[in-house]
Amino acid sequence: LASAATFAGAVAWKVLPRFFGAAKKWRNQSVAPLLAGLALLSAMAGSGLGVAVERLLLVEALLLFATLMAFMGGRIIAPAMAGYAQSEGRRLDARVQPGLEGAVLILLGLAFVLNPLPWPLLRQLAAALVISAGVLSAIRLLRWQPWRCARADLLILLLGYAWLAFGLLLLG
């Protein structure tokens, strides 16, 4: 347990300074708090706080990890799909899709804040927010036109992003 907390602290100490202050847009600035939250939740997990608290921490970590995956997946897949489309003589208009990306980040951030609160109505709202983020992630994926892709490496990335969208729907 102590070694896990030490490792999480060391990773945060090494990685976080690179992200703080370097980004200009709020979507890019969200990476540092995401990584800090994951490090903190990792350090707290298994700390003997009780099964209910550890389960809540696990769900919170899952929300943060899904947020990071949605953010990073879009930053990797969008230019790769645009380059692939260009190599085939096509133009992919929907690339990073900052509106959808921002909406997913906001929805998952709100769900992260609302989920641990003790009121059932707020937990239901958090679940609805996660489902909405899953729907928006699926829309984002479809706008990349995965059916036009024949490259195995890109198909695997698209499949991973599809699982993320599906997982958010199930988590909600």
Predicted regions mapped to residue ranges:
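Hydrophobic alpha-helical transmembrane segments of multi-pass integral membrane proteins
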Residues: 1-172
